[in-house]
Every structure is written in structure tokens, then in C-alpha cells.
């Protein structure tokens, strides 16, 4: 079996933000994140993820607009819950929008969206995007209250923040965080939402997450960009997809369908 060309087992979303970070470091036109996205598709990526931040530190508006009509898979646009970003998303019309928390001083997204604390605002954002024909995902911590709030807000998809798992410093902490994610996946299924995951995943920690049968999609970027420095971009994409699919196929957890959960 060619693992990187195995659709439907588990999807890989390639985040191209850090290709844009390299480009912007010198203010050049290269490396081109659009070219990276198209090559990633050829190498087996099931979707392309990119984060249009309010400060435009990596991805620019022009990148999103230029890339949207060229993709053969799906565009998953990450953005903050602000009216400016929601309006941009509705204008561009990606297949998916993942709403994320955002602080200007952070290096990368540091935690999940607080849907419980900002319920009315998130619910309104979900409605605006859904009315524009865009599927909405909420990037949240693996927490039962946040999952319930996400479902109540009208989000058909959640993306579980795997940062604490990725940053675990010993086996006990790692196992505890993995159990937390597994429990959150079950909770998401119970609420009838599609469950994705991502943040901090790389070539040696992705396997246990990819093996969880209830997870539909993993979004990974920095690790692939970093690995590509040594392995080459398309090889890096292929290797990550192969690792994920192999982990899922070798999992002892039955990959049973869950009625009522959107795909």
C-alpha cells in the first residue's frame, strides 16, 4: 500500500505558515507558500491550512486570495474571531474556517479558544460563516465543557489542541495528556461533531494521536517545514502522511464508523 495516497483513512492538513515566515524573513518573493501548497497536494496532503493573523506576520491577504482558486483539495483558513477576519473569510470562501484564539505577543497559538467564556461571539461567528456556505471548526482544548459549548454554538467541527501532549516532559504526563485527548474525542463524537486535532505534532510524537480512530484530520506545519530542510518538501509531506496512516492501520482501536458524526 502507498500510505501517502490512502484517502479516507486519516487526513493530513499541511500548514504553510512557516513557508511564508521564511519568505518574509528577507522580504523576498520566495519561498512561495502557494507553490509549497500545490506541491504538498501532489505529495498527498488532503488539505492546506493557513493562518491569516491580524498582524499578518506570515500569511498575507494576497496569499489567501491567490491560493484559493488553485487548490484541488480543501482550504482550511485559520483566523481570529474578529469582524474583519470573518468578513475576509466570507469574501474568499474557503471550504473550512477554523476559529482560533490570537494574541499579538505570542510566538504561536498558545491554547484553545474559550468558547464557554465568549459563547455569544463565537455562536454569531459560526452563523455568519455557515450562512456563507463555509464549514466552521473551533480550535479548542480537549475539555468537556468547551466541546459541549462548541456543539451548542453550531460548530460542526472541532480541532483539539494537542500542545500540552506535545510539550509533555515525562512518560506519565505524556500518557495523561493522551488519555485526555482520547476522552475528548469520545466526547466530541457523543455531541455529533467531527473531531480533528493539531499543534506541536512532529515525526516522533504523531503516531499515538494518528492512531485514535475518532480523529478525522491532523493539521501539521512547522515540523514538516523543518524536516523538509533536510528531507525535501514533498518527501517530508509523504513521510508524515505515511506515518499517520500506518499508525491508524496498526491501531488496536476499532476504526468503526460513528453514526451521526459529519465527515
From Swiss-Prot:
Active site (record annotation): 51, 78, 199
User: Mind listing the GO molecular function terms for this protein?
Assistant: pyridoxine 5'-phosphate synthase activity
UniProt-annotated location(s) = Cytoplasm
Q: Which organism is it from?
A: Ralstonia pickettii (strain 12J)
Describe which pathway this protein belongs to, using the record's wording. Cofactor biosynthesis; pyridoxine 5'-phosphate biosynthesis; pyridoxine 5'-phosphate from D-erythrose 4-phosphate: step 5/5
Say which enzyme class the record assigns. Answer: transferase
The record ties this protein, via SUPFAM superfamilies, to: Pyridoxine 5'-phosphate synthase
Q: Matching Gene3D superfamilies, A to Z?
A: Aldolase class I (3.20.20.70)
Q: What does this protein do?
A: Catalyzes the complicated ring closure reaction between the two acyclic compounds 1-deoxy-D-xylulose-5-phosphate (DXP) and 3-amino-2-oxopropyl phosphate (1-amino-acetone-3-phosphate or AAP) to form pyridoxine 5'-phosphate (PNP) and inorganic phosphate.
Q: Which gene encodes it?
A: pdxJ
Which GO terms are recorded in the biological process aspect for this UniProt protein?
pyridoxine biosynthetic process
- Per its UniProt record, what InterPro entries does this chain match? Aldolase_TIM (IPR013785), PyrdxlP_synth_PdxJ (IPR004569), Pyridoxine-5'_phos_synth (IPR036130)
Sorted alphabetically, the Gene Ontology cellular component annotations on this record are: cytosol
Q: Where is this site: Transition state stabilizer?
A: 159
Task: Supply the name of the protein.
Answer: Pyridoxine 5'-phosphate synthase
User: Binding residues for 3-amino-2-oxopropyl phosphate, per the UniProt record?
Assistant: 15, 26, 200, 221-222
What is this enzyme's EC? 2.6.99.2
Note the subunit structure.
Homooctamer; tetramer of dimers.
Q: Which amino acids does the record list as binding 1-deoxy-D-xylulose 5-phosphate? A: 17-18, 53, 58, 108
Catalytic reactions on record: 3-amino-2-oxopropyl phosphate + 1-deoxy-D-xylulose 5-phosphate = pyridoxine 5'-phosphate + phosphate + 2 H2O + H(+)
Amino acid at each position: 500500500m502507498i500510505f501517502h495516497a490512502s484517502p479516507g483513512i486519516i487526513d493530513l492538513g499541511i500548514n504553510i505558515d512557516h513557508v511564508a515566515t521564511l519568505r518574509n524573513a528577507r522580504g523576498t518573493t520566495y519561498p512561495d507558500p502557494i507553490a509549497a501548497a500545490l506541491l504538498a497536494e501532489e505529495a498527498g496532503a488532503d488539505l492546506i491550512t493557513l493562518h491569516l493573523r491580524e498582524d499578518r506576520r506570515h500569511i498575507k491577504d494576497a496569499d489567501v486570495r491567490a491560493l484559493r482558486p488553485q487548490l484541488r483539495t480543501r482550504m482550511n483558513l485559520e483566523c481570529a474571531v474578529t469582524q474583519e477576519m470573518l468578513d475576509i473569510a466570507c469574501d474568499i470562501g474557503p471550504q473550512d474556517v477554523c476559529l482560533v484564539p490570537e494574541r499579538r505577543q505570542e510566538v504561536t497559538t498558545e491554547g484553545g479558544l474559550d468558547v464557554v467564556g465568549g459563547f455569544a461571539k463565537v455562536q454569531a461567528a459560526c452563523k455568519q460563516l455557515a450562512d456563507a456556505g463555509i464549514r466552521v471548526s473551533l480550535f479548542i482544548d480537549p475539555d468537556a465543557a468547551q466541546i459541549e459549548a462548541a456543539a451548542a454554538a453550531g460548530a460542526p467541527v472541532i480541532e483539539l489542541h494537542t500542545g500540552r501532549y506535545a510539550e509533555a516532559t515525562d512518560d506519565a504526563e505524556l500518557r495523561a495528556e493522551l488519555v485526555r485527548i482520547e476522552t475528548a474525542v469520545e466526547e466530541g463524537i457523543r455531541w455529533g461533531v467531527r473531531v480533528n486535532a493539531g499543534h506541536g505534532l512532529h515525526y516522533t510524537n504523531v503516531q499515538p494521536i494518528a492512531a485514535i480512530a475518532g480523529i478525522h484530520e491532523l493539521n501539521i506545519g512547522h515540523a514538516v517545514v523543518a524536516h523538509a530542510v533536510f528531507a525535501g518538501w514533498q518527501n517530508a509531506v509523504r513521510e508524515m502522511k505515511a506515518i499517520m496512516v500506518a499508525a491508524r492501520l496498526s491501531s488496536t482501536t476499532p476504526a468503526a464508523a460513528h453514526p451521526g458524526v459529519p465527515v
